[in-house]
Regions:
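Short, Lys/Arg-enriched, Trp-marked, Pro/Gly-tolerant hinge/linker segments that flank
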Residues: 156-161, 178-191, 198-222
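His/acidic/aromatic-lined binding-pocket segments of jelly-roll/cupin-type domains
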Residues: 63-66, 70-75, 88-90, 96-97, ...
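A hydrophobic/aromatic-rich effector-binding and dimerization subdomain
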Residues: 2-21, 40-42, 50, 110-176
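Short histidine-centered beta-strand/loop micro-motifs
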Residues: 60-67, 108-110, 130, 185
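Histidine-centered metal-chelating micro-motifs
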Residues: 79-81, 97, 101-106, 125-127
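Short acidic-glycine-tyrosine-enriched beta hairpin
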Residues: 86-101, 109-111, 115
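Generic protein-terminus/edge-of-domain signal
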Residues: 1-79, 137-141
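Amphipathic, well-ordered alpha-helical segments in soluble domains
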Residues: 71, 166-173, 192, 199
Length: 222
């Protein structure tokens, strides 16, 4: 990742500064209006937007929660430790974690040099990616089930693709586009996500796909 972009993402946010100043927990009002800790797309995405990004909040334990949108977590530098179904899932630099709307997870405190991006995505954003990836393969079918299912079952996918240069370049392009906010690039970003899906299909040997309540791989492909 370009140093200038990484430096931009490393800047301490107002929320993080309050934590450093002594606020010991996440301010849930920034994320949800309800009693149940479900992060709300209405608070995270501007009206009419299908996708947005924000840096993961460091220096604090992020308590168990889920989202009413799709979350894709990408670690730019360092690592991030999630707890899903009682199991530690460590995401290292260059890796991706897809979480559907029903997956509850908590995140252990990240340090200053642990830089992660949360992609907050409404399901319809993936329509172009579905078209590009097709449906005649196991991974594409699994992605469809994870990302668009009506059944309230938490699932996640962990892609260890730090060495796949094409995926890293595409992710950097999309992060830059969303961070700078230059123009309405929904279509470009949807197509970029479609290309990422295509490369993920070529990289299934690096994928771990699990149900949070199971400790074994749900499916293994090489």
């Amino acid at each position: 990742m370009q140093q200038a972009l990484l430096d931009h993402l490393r800047v301490v946010t107002e929320e993080e500064q309050r934590i450093l100043d002594g606020v010991a927990e996440v301010d849930k009002d920034l994320y949800t209006s309800g009693k149940d800790f479900t992060v709300d797309s209405a608070k995270m995405l501007s009206e009419g937007k299908l996708i947005a990004v924000r840096t993961h909040t460091r220096f604090v334990h992020f308590p168990s929660h889920r989202h009413n949108y799709i979350e894709v977590l990408y670690v730019c530098q360092g690592q991030l430790t999630n707890i899903i179904g009682g199991k530690e899932v460590v995401i290292h630099a260059g890796e991706l974690l897809f979480l559907n709307q029903y997956t509850r997870h908590e995140i252990l405190p990240a340090g200053e040099e642990d830089i992660a991006i949360n992609f907050m995505i409404l399901p319809e954003f993936f329509d172009v990616a579905y078209t590009m990836a097709g449906s005649n393969n196991v991974l594409a079918d699994f992605l469809v089930n994870v990302l668009r299912q009506d059944e309230e079952r938490g699932e996640y996918l962990h892609f260890k693709v730090a060495e796949v240069l094409q995926i890293q370049n595409l992710l950097e392009n999309m992060i830059y586009s969303l961070v700078t906010g230059k123009g309405d690039q929904n279509r470009i970003n949807q197509t970029t996500m479609g290309l990422i899906f295509l490369y993920l299909l070529e990289s299934v040997q690096y994928a771990e796909m699990r149900l949070p309540n199971q400790y074994e791989n749900m499916i293994t492909m090489t």
